[in-house]
């Protein structure tokens, strides 16, 4: 209950309304602050991330999963041709791309950013011979390199050093991926037309084993 506030010997002035508004405002502010603190405790403090950088990182999850699908398609092609070594090489490529997708996924979650999973397109490469697969693989890696560079550039523009540090690993990784794809093309050009040499190359690729990514989040 509120009472009029006045000073002895002076004309009475009623501050009841102003006093109540002030008290109500304080209550609202306290409740708002409490709610914000509750959200921080429950969900964690949300880091500030540029909208463009966030969008590109989220899209890259989809791109990496598509890469895994594409390499599974390549593995399936070589399996159907009886070249299990080539099939193994591309199966491991698919596993690596899946790992890359999860690294982007985990990074966004660790920054308390929203992750939106998009539908994955069906791979539809034009393949008429073994070399088509290898060249398509190189072209795709060059495409992914461009995507990584684009995200890095966007992060640099807004001085998002944390994201730049995260992407450093992928910049190096893409250089290695392009080198591997080029090397495989060179070997196929040298040995692909000779059945005995192709058999030996297939055996070499069959020896490849999966290695988990060195980047740990």
Where are these regions (language model features)?
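Iron-associated oxidoreductase/ferritin-like identity signal
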Residues: 2-10, 14, 18-217
